[in-house]
């Protein structure tokens, strides 16, 4: 099998996006369009990925700093052929070269594998698609069924404009052939640009075979030149993700109101209500229920967990049979054990909460360790920050913390301790101790409240 190199064209400015971002950095499912294409190239086990860039070079390089690509600069954008000419010096003669577009993010590995398999030994294969409205696309010109040319919209005559089979721009041939044809391109056309479409005519002139594979799903090859098209690609992508999850057994209450911006691994009988967003890598156990409006990013969630509406989790783990929300926030480093209860307006950050413990209302637990079977009342705060440094609070097992308690870290609360409501804890508490620190309550009989002056 020949080696494979992929060339991704990503030099365009994207004027119709009306944005400072290069077009290919606009996102589908939370990921830049060009990153989708790079990931597909990786799935094909490409030996090299050449990224043609121009506009927004610094932004592209910063967003894609970790990607294994060969950066190829295109100073002037003089057409697709000109872009490929910049990459040609890197082509090995005996390798396959696959040309892709950074603003067509939904192209699939399976379609590209079919295209590569269809490439003649001595020839070129291109990906086409039939469109009801082919306006703006290069038309496929055939003679006796064989592809002989591609004519761009602005260069097509009246008869050619009636053709509905169009060029997607995706093609594959060997490096030696591409280099030969690229050297013979000219810009004698209405746009004054160098078209890769002219390569098909040159291949025919040289007696090379031209194969064509038609994409079965036209959305796979759609690009995004403006935000309307970008939104259409987003909705289509989300529709396909929702469809797949439903067929795998996940109950999406309304598939049209669910967004997956990463990967979701799931067990059986999971149920996800409307307007839930999944980001990054999320793993659900069996029978997990997620209420409306939740946002969950990079989390692992155990069996039989119930997440009530409008909760936001990031980089957290949740044990089996836990109940969380509504309106709860788990920040990075939150680790909840089995059968924990986290209630409304509770925030947990870089903290562990032991099995069976309850933090039910209006509480902040940060940089802390909470043992098993504890109860933290409403308004409890772990005061973990002195303006410069973070400190840890350690709470043992079976500890009761009353409402409106401040735990000023660093502080340790031993097993079985009880802390009365309104207490400010600044010293360690021993095992089974009761701690109360309150201003003595005063009663003033006959007190007259101040009155407003009229």
Curated annotation (Swiss-Prot):
CDD domains reported in the protein's UniProt record: GT2_GlmU_N_bac, LbH_GlmU_C
Catalytic residue list: 361
GO cellular component, one term: cytoplasm
Keyword presence, Iron-sulfur: no
Location of region: N-acetyltransferase: 249-454
Sites where the protein binds acetyl-CoA: 378, 384-385, 403, 421, 438
Enzyme Commission numbers on file: 2.7.7.23, 2.3.1.157
Binding residues annotated for Mg(2+), in chain numbering: 103, 225
Pathway where it operates: Nucleotide-sugar biosynthesis; UDP-N-acetyl-alpha-D-glucosamine biosynthesis; N-acetyl-alpha-D-glucosamine 1-phosphate from alpha-D-glucosamine 6-phosphate (route II): step 2/2; Nucleotide-sugar biosynthesis; UDP-N-acetyl-alpha-D-glucosamine biosynthesis; UDP-N-acetyl-alpha-D-glucosamine from N-acetyl-alpha-D-glucosamine 1-phosphate: step 1/1; Bacterial outer membrane biogenesis; LPS lipid A biosynthesis
Region (Pyrophosphorylase): 1-227
Region (Linker): 228-248
GO BP, sorted A to Z: cell morphogenesis; cell wall organization; lipid A biosynthetic process; peptidoglycan biosynthetic process; regulation of cell shape; UDP-N-acetylglucosamine biosynthetic process
GO molecular function, one term: glucosamine-1-phosphate N-acetyltransferase activity
Keywords: Acyltransferase, Cell shape, Cell wall biogenesis/degradation, Cytoplasm, Magnesium, Metal-binding, Multifunctional enzyme, Nucleotidyltransferase, Peptidoglycan synthesis, Repeat, Transferase
UniProt binding sites for UDP-N-acetyl-alpha-D-glucosamine: 9-12, 23, 74, 79-80, 101-103, 138, 152, 167, 225, 331, 349, 364, 375
Predominant localisation class: cytoplasm
Transmembrane segments: none
Subcellular location(s) of the protein: Cytoplasm
Keyword Cytoplasm part of the UniProt annotation: yes
Record's cofactor remark: Binds 1 Mg(2+) ion per subunit.
Catalytic activity of the protein: alpha-D-glucosamine 1-phosphate + acetyl-CoA = N-acetyl-alpha-D-glucosamine 1-phosphate + CoA + H(+); N-acetyl-alpha-D-glucosamine 1-phosphate + UTP + H(+) = UDP-N-acetyl-alpha-D-glucosamine + diphosphate
Cofactor: Mg(2+)
Function description: Catalyzes the last two sequential reactions in the de novo biosynthetic pathway for UDP-N-acetylglucosamine (UDP-GlcNAc). The C-terminal domain catalyzes the transfer of acetyl group from acetyl coenzyme A to glucosamine-1-phosphate (GlcN-1-P) to produce N-acetylglucosamine-1-phosphate (GlcNAc-1-P), which is converted into UDP-GlcNAc by the transfer of uridine 5-monophosphate (from uridine 5-triphosphate), a reaction catalyzed by the N-terminal domain.
Subunit structure, as described in the record: Homotrimer.
Protein family membership: In the N-terminal section; belongs to the N-acetylglucosamine-1-phosphate uridyltransferase family. In the C-terminal section; belongs to the transferase hexapeptide repeat family.
The name this protein goes by in its record: Bifunctional protein GlmU
